[in-house]
Amino acid sequence: TNNWNESLDFIKDKKCDIISSISPSYDRMSYLNFTKPILTLPIVVTTQKDKPFLRDISLLKNEKIAILKGHFIAEYIKDYFPYLKIVEVASMNEGLYLVEQGEVYGYIDNALVLSSTIQKEFSNSLKIGFRFDILDELSIGTRNDEPILNDIFSRLVDDLDETKKQEFLNTWTII
């Protein structure tokens, strides 16, 4: 597929059988089964470098926050932080650009993808400014009308050792 939302549409429409690196959400449970998490990562807010580190997300009352359209965190934010104004974006780079330009206060995603992208492309302008208590539990999602498929992937995930997980992280993390 060309982007995350197209991937979600394909799995919903049963044009594909699995989707990797997906977090469970109430909505997604209506059409997917999930393995246990492969990776568990903190959810963070990226801000401009000159913004203060936040101790409490309520300090952003009525601020615009960008979130990737279709990201599980959007449901969570709408439920638990309704005072934040969500701006859905088509890509992470679009969200980070809006932060850089001052059109939104921050962009929310998991720490792994954000820290890597900030270091590569936005190191002079953006930083991690807040960490939520919620975690992004990246799992494999399978069509819920194919329970045997979920059993197979669940066994594969159960067999992953910590060395393999660390190799994956090392591949995608810049130090």
Question: Locations of the language-model features?
Answer:
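Proline/Glycine/Serine-rich low-complexity intrinsically disordered segments
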Residues: 1-175
